[in-house]
Amino acid sequence: DDILQLDNTIQALVLLIGTNNAGAFTSEEIAGGIQKLVKMVEEKAPEAKVLVLGVFPRGPAINDPKNTRIHALNAKLKDLADGKRVFYLDVGPSLAEPDGSISREVMPDNLHVALPGFLRWMEAMKPTLEGLLPNRPQETTAGQQDPG
């Protein structure tokens, strides 16, 4: 119970977990563990929105056979979303090139993202996350934050 320490000031929480389990556990087992974490967040931070991210693809291309299990897992993670407090987003496609390949600049080891991958991830996630944060300060034309 003390594993997840949250307070009521959290507006949103992003979960990206499960890739390290993909080799040893079934999609159902991994999704079940993530569902337990989502429930813990709901109990400890009842006002927080939870954005569950799809597990990123592995290998040199999005349609690489290694990703079959990841696609199955992501389908189960999508089912966790209720559209009220729990949301799902798959940013994996944003990491791929138009032909479906994943460049070494984005994922040098076919698993971990590098700076170009982080930038794509951020851009893909930004609109959804902004929609979950109704109380965030607005930008002014000078680029400074307007407190309200």
Predicted feature descriptions by range:
Residues 4, 41-42, 78-81:
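N-terminal cationic-hydrophobic initiation segments that often serve targeting/anchoring roles
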Residues 57-148:
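Catalytic His-Asp segment of secreted/periplasmic serine-dependent ester chemistry enzymes
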Residues 1-35, 40, 51, 55-61:
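Oxyanion-hole/transition-state-stabilizing segment in secreted/luminal serine hydrolases
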Residues 34-37, 41, 76-77, 125:
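Hydrophobic alpha-helical packing residues
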Residues 45-49:
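A short helix->loop->beta-strand "cap" motif at the edges of active sites that frequently abuts
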